[in-house]
Amino acid sequence: MERLQRLGGAIGAAANYLAKSCPPGIPQQPTARLQLMDSQIQVLTMAVDIIHQPLQDFERSLSDEQRAKLNGATPVKRALSARRDNTVIHSCGASTAAIDWSIGQIEKSVQLNEQQRPALSDVQQAFGKAATDLEAHCPTSVPRSAVARLETIESRLDATWRAILSIQVALQDFEGKLTDDQKYRFQSMTFAAE
């Protein structure tokens, strides 16, 4: 019972931490949005860290039968898990078309000269590498245990954080090569989620 209470307290603490860390809004500028994503990934990672050890302690304290119930060993839960597995697999695919579209929009809006094009190419490569790295950390199925699911989330958050950092570096370098007018056009762009 004590371990369950510790887990409940950790979940409550993580929820409060997340609630206090919610941004008041989403910035318009691409680099500012990436900075916000960076900070939110760090917040999510901290929340997962708060829960991890109490969850692990709780799971270890259970009998095999209790652990099976916690991990969803009922026919209904297995069916839901199979449906979720299918969703996980489909939601992780990298979209080169979306990357190419975004790069095309930047090129059209900003109107680059020949000396600036390599920096945009670096941005495109950073997006492509980030997509590949995220794909490599995409789970092929939902792990059975609660701790394993949490560890999968931790791994995915870490991969997302590294992807954001690589894109930030490329975007900052790209922005540094733009004229003031081009920077204004770039910062004024909006990108709809594809």
Question: What kind of feature is each model-predicted range?
Answer:
Residues 1-194:
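Charge-rich (acidic/polar
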